[in-house]
């Protein structure tokens, strides 16, 4: 999260996804792309690995059409179209931003969006896709779950994690990347190119997975172990340190790690809220006004601020 926050403040915060990482995730949805129009609307022209991957795998995936938009912050840009035989480059009147009028026209004509949007615009990007009812497979940071609209989509079962979750991934960055630190182990130089290792990266999607997460089973119990599950100072829920420590005999509210969302089964649990900031993301329990007036922090447990927690509640009669 540290590097993510710093990158949000940098002007050149683009992270370019590696070919092999795209291939590994797309392979988990073998039938999702057949006969579909794929749009890569946060693209970097011909050199983008999203463009190169889908062009090279066009026939293997059974695509109908591939469209990519090249973003040019300094002036007019272009779009790329590929029908399996010929590449056509067409000029755009604007800079190719994903939220421009031209890009939205192309979005409406597409079936699936696959790309790596700027981290700082992740919520705006995903909300735009959801607004237009599009299927998507996009990269983002785990911390994005704490954004109001992103968590709301999780809660409404319109968004979930892909197959690669909470991973430390290498991204190619610009050679003049302002946050580059040659002494840091998080930067790698290879064949004249610069890469940064970014922790906590996940794929986010609304594509159907082959299997729904299995029923969560743990050996942990609340009764007799109350000391292991202290309550949050400013929120009426117990604190759970690890997913494997979720007590299955507890039916009240509990704050669990973000990684729980990777095994979330809506038939077993209900998503209530997210404690990502001093205040609850959705304010489901209407606590924020009180917490704000007393300068509290809903993440605190015994005065110590904890990392992001998802508030869940177990459904009755599920043990």
Swiss-Prot record:
GO terms for biological process: methylation. Induction: Detected after 6 and 96 hours growth, there are fewer copies at 96 hours (at protein level). Disruption phenotype: Essential it cannot be disrupted. It holds the Pfam family EcoRI_methylase. The keyword Iron does not apply. Belongs to the N(4)/N(6)-methyltransferase family. This is Type II methyltransferase M.MpnI. It comes from Mycoplasma pneumoniae (strain ATCC 29342 / M129 / Subtype 1). The lineage of its organism: Bacteria, Bacillati, Mycoplasmatota, Mycoplasmoidales, Mycoplasmoidaceae.
């Amino acid at each position: 999260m540290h590097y993510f926050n710093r990158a949000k403040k940098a002007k050149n915060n683009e992270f370019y996804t590696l070919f092999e990482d795209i291939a590994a995730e797309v392979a988990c949805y073998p039938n999702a792309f057949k006969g579909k129009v794929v749009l890569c609307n946060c693209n970097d022209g011909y050199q983008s690995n999203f463009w190169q991957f889908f062009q090279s795998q066009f026939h293997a995936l059974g695509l109908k059409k591939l469209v990519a938009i090249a973003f040019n912050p300094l002036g007019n840009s272009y779009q790329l179209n590929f029908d399996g035989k010929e590449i056509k480059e067409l000029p755009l009147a604007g800079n190719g931003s994903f939220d421009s009028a031209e890009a939205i026209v192309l979005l409406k004509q597409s079936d699936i969006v696959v790309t790596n949007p700027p981290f700082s615009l992740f919520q705006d990007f995903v909300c735009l896709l959801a607004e237009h009812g599009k299927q998507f497979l996009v990269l983002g940071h785990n911390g994005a779950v704490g954004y109001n609209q992103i968590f709301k989509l999780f809660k409404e079962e319109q968004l979930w994690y892909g197959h690669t979750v909470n991973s430390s991934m290498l991204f190619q960055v610009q050679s003049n990347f302002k946050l580059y630190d040659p002494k840091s182990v998080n930067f790698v130089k290879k064949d004249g190119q610069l890469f940064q290792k970014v922790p906590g990266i996940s794929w986010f999607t609304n594509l159907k997975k082959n299997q729904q997460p299995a029923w969560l089973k743990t050996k942990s119990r609340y009764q007799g172990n109350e000391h292991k599950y202290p309550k949050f100072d400013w929120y009426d829920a117990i604190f759970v340190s690890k997913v494997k420590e979720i007590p299955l005999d507890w039916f009240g509210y509990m704050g669990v790690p973000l990684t729980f969302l990777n095994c979330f089964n809506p038939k077993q649990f209900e998503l209530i809220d997210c404690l990502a900031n001093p205040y609850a993301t959705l304010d489901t329990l209407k606590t924020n006004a009180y917490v704000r007036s007393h300068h509290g922090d809903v993440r605190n447990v015994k005065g110590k601020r904890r990392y992001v927690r998802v508030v869940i509640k177990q459904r009755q009669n599920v043990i």
